[in-house]
């Protein structure tokens, strides 16, 4: 089909931004609800009685530690095992070594920063991070797919104040 100088290409239909926004919010709520149901099924199948924070982080403290809990700016060293909800193994300190980071400072999952503040030196816990607290829409572009819920088994090895 040809176009003359007087006839321009047909215009694409205009999108009502408010309708688009409402539609995206609806879809996001549905996806978040489905993710929460999957986490609930995971915990029920395994008989885990986990606590839930306001952000959606699930946690179970398996062993209490000693001393004060981690605070923002403290240096924390952890041993860990990371898997997906379906049990797919992703990473562990057994193969990669312990991880050291500063609470609320380093670029790690926000759910880890939130959960680590519940623990002190020597503590062991299981965290379930919904995708928005883990690697989000993109995953880690390696072993953790996009929009994946992540399960952490974590142990605090060292907890120190930074100068």
Question: What do these predicted regions represent?
Answer:
Residues 5-163:
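Cross-family detector of peptidyl-prolyl cis-trans isomerase
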């Amino acid at each position: 089909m040809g176009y003359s100088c007087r006839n321009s290409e047909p215009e694409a239909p205009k999108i009502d931004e408010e309708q688009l926004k409402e539609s995206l919010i609806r879809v996001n709520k549905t996806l978040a609800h489905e993710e929460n149901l999957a986490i609930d099924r995971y915990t029920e199948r395994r008989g885990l009685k986990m606590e839930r924070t306001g952000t959606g982080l699930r946690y179970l403290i398996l062993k209490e530690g000693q001393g004060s809990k981690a605070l923002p700016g403290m240096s924390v060293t952890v041993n860990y095992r990371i898997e997906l909800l379906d049990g797919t193994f992703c990473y562990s300190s057994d193969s990669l070594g312990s991880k050291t980071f500063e609470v609320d400072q380093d670029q790690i999952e926000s759910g880890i920063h939130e959960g680590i503040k519940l623990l002190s030196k020597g503590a062991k816990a299981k965290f379930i991070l919904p995708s928005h607290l883990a690697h989000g829409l993109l995953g880690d572009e390696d072993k953790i797919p996009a929009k994946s819920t992540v399960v952490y088994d974590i142990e605090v090895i060292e907890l120190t104040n930074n100068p």
